[in-house]
Each structure stands twice: as C-alpha cells, then as structure tokens.
Amino acid sequence: MENSTTTISREELEELQEAFNKIDIDNSGYVSDYELQDLFKEASLPLPGYKVREIVEKILSVADSNKDGKISFEEFVSLMQELKSKDISKTFRKIINKREGITAIGGTSTISSEGTQHSYSEEEKVAFVNWINKALENDPDCKHLIPMNPNDDSLFKSLADGILLCKMINLSEPDTIDERAINKKKLTPFTISENLNLALNSASAIGCTVVNIGASDLKEGKPHLVLGLLWQIIKVGLFADIEISRNEALIALLNEGEELEELMKLSPEELLLRWVNYHLTNAGWHTISNFSQDIKDSRAYFHLLNQIAPKGGEDGPAIAIDLSGINETNDLKRAGLMLQEADKLGCKQFVTPADVVSGNPKLNLAFVANLFNTYPCLHKPNNNDIDMNLLEGESKEERTFRNWMNSLGVNPYINHLYSDLADALVIFQLYEMIRVPVNWSHVNKPPYPALGGNMKKIENCNYAVELGKNKAKFSLVGIAGQDLNEGNSTLTLALVWQLMRRYTLNVLSDLGEGEKVNDEIIIKWVNQTLKSANKKTSISSFKDKSISTSLPVLDLIDAIAPNAVRQEMIRRENLSDEDKLNNAKYAISVARKIGARIYALPDDLVEVKPKMVMTVFACLMGKGLNRIK
C-alpha cells in the first residue's frame, strides 16, 4: 500500500475519494460487490451481464487484499493504481464519471477525509421536494415549511427542525411515530435535536440505514445525507403494498408453470418490472429489463399508461390516453407528451422529461411504483391450484428483525426474511458486526451457478451455523445449515434473535468497560434507577405483567431524561386496552426521542413479549449509562 500511494497527487486522491463516495451508496465506508454491480447497472453501460460480473470479479480479485468481500478506500486507491493502464480502468472511470446532474460540495464532516467531496443529484432534490409538497400540503403542522421551492436549497433548511422528517416517516409507515412526542412549538436547539433523534431512530426502526448519519448532519442540512435518508423513507412508503401477502392481485403476475413460492421471493423492484412487462405484453409491445436504458424513449410508458388507465365501469370514469405522442421524433418532447398523459391519471410525480430521457433509474423506479400504487389494474386469478396458506404475511417479530438488519446497512437489502437469508451472506455480515470473525475465503459469493448453486448456498449456511456454535457460542441445538437454506422459520428466528441480542448487549458492554451484561444486570439497573428517582414502578423480569401498561418504561425514561415525558399524556389508573396501547406508543416514541435506538413495537410492550421487552430496557440502560459518562 505504501508504494502505491507515493505516486498519487493530492488532486488525484481527492478525485478518487469522490469516486469512492459515489459508489459507496450506503455510506458504510466500504464498497461491496453488490455496490459495484449496482454501479454498472445504474450507469446504463451497455454491457452484457456476464461482462459486468467479469469486471466486478476482476476488480475484487485485484483490490480485495484481505479477502473480506469488500473494498476499503485504501484498497480502492491501490486498485486504481494497478488498473491505471488497463482497459478495465477506463471502463470503470467512465462509469463513475457518467453520473450526470451531480452537484459536488466539499466534505465537512469530522469523519470525512480532509478535502473530500460529496455529491448529490439536483434531479433527486427536485423530485423529493415536489413529492413532499404534495404529500404534506394539508398538514397544519407543516404550514411554516410547505410548499418548499424545488429550485433552491430550501429542502435542506426545511428538514432541519425534524418535523417534516417525522411526518414523512409516518406517511411511509403509519403510526411509527406518536405525534404527541414531536416537538412542534417554540422550538429550541435542544427540542430540535430531540425531533431529529426521534426521526433518525424511527427511520432505523422501519429499516432505513442510518449508521453514518447524526442529528447534527440533518440540522446542518448536509445534502448527500439528507437525500440518502429521504430516498430510503420515501421508498418504504412506495413499496409498502408491492408485497404479495398485502396485495393478492399480484398473483396475476405468475408466469406459466411458475410456483407461487418463487414469485414471493421477488423484491419489490423485480415485481414492479414484472408488472410493467405484464401490461406491455397485453399491449403487444416488447418487454423491458430495467428502469433506465429501456424506458428512455418513453414508448413503453405510453403503452403502460394506456393499459392501466380506467376504461369506465367498476374502475371509475374512463380516462382516454392519447398515444399519438409515440410518433414524436424528439425524445425530450416525446417524454413531455407522455408525462401529460400520466398527469391525466394524477401520476406525473418523480420524473421530468429529462429524467426519463437520461434514464435516471432511481426516479423512474419511483415513478413506476407510484403508477402501480394508484392504478395497479390487476385482478386476482380464480386459480384453485394456488396454495393460499403461503400468503400469510410476515409476523411483527419477523418484520422487526428484518428492519433491524436493514438499518445496519446489510447488503443485499432484506425484503423477505427467510428467502433472503438462504445463502447466509447477510448472516456473515451480522457476525462481523457482533465481532465474530468471518473467514471470507470460506464463503461462496453470488452470482451462483445454475447447476449446483443451491449447494454453494448450503455450504455457506453450514459455515454460518458452525460459526454460531463454535465462535459466537450461541445455543443452536438441532439447527443445521439446510434449515437456514430452506427458511425453517423457528430455527432461523432462533439464530437471528441471538444475533440481535448479542448486538444489543455488546453496546452495553462497551459502555460498561467491557464487563459482560446479562438479563439480571439489566433488571437490577432498571430497578435501581427507578428507585433512586423515587418512582413507584419496578419489574421482576421481562415477563412482568406490569410492563403491559408501559408505566415502568415511561418512568425509566423520566428518570434518565427528566422532562422528556409529558405526564399529562399518560394514563395510570383503570387502563383499558386502548389506554395501554396509547401508553406504549408514547413510550416507544419518547424513548427514541431521547436517543434510544429501539426496534420494538408498541404491541411488544402491551403483549409483554420478553425478547423485545429486553431490547427496550437494554437500549434505555445504554442511554442512561451514556448520560452518566
């Protein structure tokens, strides 16, 4: 490494840092093979899939010196030196520089290298501003902020008090934040920080990656961080119903001879692509394989709009789509005419004609998702061969685990807990996060061969179980790699819970000078803290029935952060089920507001789910110890 950096000028180092930041989509400080693959896809480089894989494999083989499946900035610098004279480097640099509409700003964060540049997309900013303006135009709490001007930097200033972010989170995942916990009037720097903590910890709880974002970054309106977080929040809302268990009409997208189980493994992006192609096939038009290169001429969109527009009758009054714009010779004008037709359906959000013609994949994906949510135009087939038992949605516990993993920035994103863990890649990433070393040379990585691919995944799962038993010292009695690969829910959850538990306890051990923390220590600390604050509540275990009132949690928050809890919001006597739920909603939101990263749901407190209850008290203990320090 020493030798390779001596020949790099400061200017070149800055250029490389900028390139690295563009590829490092999740801001993890590392670039994974998935991010490299995404880069080629996003750049709309007309390369066949095998060529992309070849280049990615070459890059990893050259750059990944410690074989951990990802590239650090130092490894990236070495790589670019090594590839300088080769064709692959030219291709690679061409892709990085191909991202247009990019505004570069100097890096100011204390963790960013001196002189780095973070870039953000002007198009994304405009699209998000217009979407938020429309979504919150009638919210009285946002009157002082909305409408924002899409053509200046008002977005970054308007998000600085945390109110808009909290509102957007609730739009994407209703009831995530208890509105009573949002500070709305006479804001001070402290109450603004509380709002931003509430937004960040709530975003984390719905599966957004927030590992490198702090309240101060949002307060300062750092564009690349703000836009990255906003996109994640908006995407959660756009994709909420693109899920077969929540929208059975999607079964209509089954291909000839395909099992429902296979369709259920598809990500929302893949389902959207299939939905578009379903309608294009019905229109007699050729199918597409992406939301960038293939939609640039707008013609597929014209046919899609014509297929999904109401025809009268049950769908409501007919809306006629004018297809004459297909014959327009100018791409930009054709895209403009197409968006005029989309506007008839009330769905021209997210893209401008230029975004369509440039093939902006993120904004075109959002445009299509919004079309799907408004006019899916699918009818559930009357097919008796389909096993409807498969359509049971995920449990609240499964969703919590999935959101926890995604919030930590695992790659790939987990859409379906069991099928997306079938190759154990994400489990290995979680092991690393709980400080269980993974020997990446033992791990098979995608793309898996068509023949024997599942064996490669099972080998990974066997290694994951072996690490759990021998290195992490988990209790994994009766669990084999095949159970993970097949998505055995009970056994997979047993491993995932132990990963989450260890992660939570590690945070506490770090605060307590490394001493091992267990349930007894947490319970003892909770009771001592409650007693020293003269509270009447206490808990005997994480199964204590009094937890269903949420009063021990609220009293503990008050002991740790006096004045955070507004006592008039709490019911203490003769609690109905509704009162208990309201207390729980308030408790979870106020805990997040004081900085506790809690993934549990209000129902976990009301129903006294001991595992999730433990994580709530552990996170609050972490917050309490942090304050003392």
Curated annotation (Swiss-Prot):
Pfam families in UniProt: CH, EF-hand_7
Question: Where is it located?
Answer: Cytoplasm; Cell projection, Stereocilium
Taxonomic superkingdom: Eukaryota
Q: What is this protein called?
A: Plastin-1
Which keywords appear in this protein's UniProt record, sorted alphabetically? Acetylation, Actin-binding, Calcium, Cell projection, Cytoplasm, Deafness, Disease variant, Metal-binding, Non-syndromic deafness, Phosphoprotein, Repeat
* GO biological process terms, semicolon-separated: actin filament bundle assembly; actin filament network formation; auditory receptor cell stereocilium organization; intestinal D-glucose absorption; positive regulation of multicellular organism growth; positive regulation of protein localization to plasma membrane; regulation of microvillus length; terminal web assembly
| SMART domains in UniProt | CH, EFh
Region spans: Actin-binding 1 = 108-380
Chain positions found as N-acetylmethionine: 1
PANTHER family xref list: FIMBRIN/PLASTIN, PLASTIN-1
Q: Does the keyword Repeat apply?
A: yes
- Main subcellular localisation: cytoplasm
Q: How does it assemble?
A: Monomer.
Question: Where does the chain bind Ca(2+) 2?
Answer: 64, 66, 68, 70, 75
Give the protein's biological function: Actin-bundling protein. In the inner ear, it is required for stereocilia formation. Mediates liquid packing of actin filaments that is necessary for stereocilia to grow to their proper dimensions.
Taxon lineage: Eukaryota, Metazoa, Chordata, Craniata, Vertebrata
- Native organism: Homo sapiens (Human)
Q: Where expressed (tissues)?
A: In small intestine, colon, and kidney; relatively lower levels of expression are detected in the lung and stomach.
What the entry lists under InterPro entries is as follows:
Actinin_actin-bd_CS, CH_dom, CH_dom_sf, EF-hand-dom_pair, EF_Hand_1_Ca_BS, EF_hand_dom, Fimbrin/Plastin
Q: How is it modified after translation?
A: Phosphorylated.
Keyword Cytoplasm listed: yes
